Amino acid sequence: MPNESENTRSTISNIRKILSQAEKGGVQNTIQNCVTVLQNDPIFADSIRLNLLSERIDIVKPMGWQRSGPTLTDTDMMYILRRMEKYGLYSEKRVSAAIRIVANENHYHPIRDYLNDLKWDGAERISHALHRFLGAVEDELTTEALKIFLLGAIKRVFHPGCKFEMMLCLVGGQGAGKSSFFRLLAIKDEWFSDDLRRLDDDNVFRKLQGHWIMEMSEMIATANAKSIEEIKSFLSKQKETYKIPYETHPADRLRQCVFAGTTNRQDFLPRDRTGNRRFIPIPVDAAQAEVHILDNEAESRAYIDQLWAEAMTIYNSGDYKLTFSPAMQEALQICQKDFMQEDMQAGMIYAFLEDYTGDRVCSKQLYAEALGNLNLPAEWETRAICEIMTAGIANGEIKGWTAHKAAKRYPKYGVQKGWERVTAAKVDADGFAELTDEEAQQMGFPF
């Protein structure tokens, strides 16, 4: 901190006069006195702000000592405490409390500020951006996918915790600049992160803090049926609950970020019989791109500024949805099939049922006898088998079977829900057909 000038000493003296005094003389060591100093001292005034994105306290003006970033540090606290001593204020606990009060009353949101300051030039870019930088096909699905992703990112900033489950996945195009596209789309490098590699990490939720666009590359590249369920569940969450260092109790942290995927694997989507609606694959091709996004980074950033400006114009109009129309949803499902893995388990179950002569099967039986497993199935594996059967019966790939309504006993597997063969009515030697229970009830017979 530079040497004090005569004006600085005069300022300190003037501020001391407005501080509450102790009965026996001297300044009272109160939180309010600390707040008064922080609001009036020329070094502190308008310098300490709560960042609503990172939920950390930032120092946003030069303070007279060496600093490496905006976030308040322990070193900053030492300098602040030293200056507070000039006012006769010596309680670190009260100074810290005053800093939190002043910061909270002077909060800001850097991304909201950025978006609100944009002025759109009227040129449409959303329909062209993914082709320009990544060689994606210019069609309605590609345009809608990017538009919904941008609008979802905007809404998450202005309405943290809003429901938004979509992940835009850029597929293929080795060296096309997929990750660079998302990094530049986040505007500032600190608003982007690709550090989310495991969902079972104890610190996973803290890794979301302060970021706007989260790229999930490794998890998408290695996704399987189990992990894709975990990713789907993770994408569906709207908040995390944890405490940050200076807090005593955990608090709900509403999500302000959106998630993006990048992979070179063409079959990155496991077969998901409940639907892969959250994952929006967009194939890219570096050879078809007009420019590489890093060829002229300044020009690319200016383009992306206008991309967000166009999206903000749509957002402010209120005329948008964060979901696909039925027609686009159908187009998406067709597109997703090109990126799905071969469903070997379904094929094995279909083949087993074709040769099976019994009248009933359950998921544990299929797990052991159709798929050849010796261990007991995990819950997600049982669920996957049920999904195969439900989808297969619905789409006609499994014929002659239906789910039985009540659980039944299976000799090797205990009481289980399962499926039973749909057979033609049994006919006896005299030509009489045996009624099913349902038919008998409909005819009023007392069975």
Question: Where do the PLM segments sit?
Answer:
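Long, low-complexity, charged/polar intrinsically disordered regions in eukaryotic proteins
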Residues: 302-335
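P-loop NTPase catalytic core of nucleic-acid-dependent motor ATPases
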Residues: 99-209, 213, 364
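A short helix-turn-beta junction within AAA+ P-loop NTPase domains corresponding to the substrate/partner-engaging
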Residues: 269-290
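Conserved AAA+/SF3 P-loop NTPase catalytic/coupling segment centered on the Walker-B
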Residues: 213-235, 270-275
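Conserved catalytic/switch belt of AAA+ P-loop NTPases
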Residues: 228-251
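N-terminal nucleic-acid engagement/recognition segments and initiation subdomains in replication
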Residues: 1-125, 140-144, 375-380, 391, ...
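DNA transaction DNA-binding modules
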Residues: 322-447
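AAA+/SF3 P-loop NTPase mechanochemical coupling elements
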Residues: 204-209, 244-262
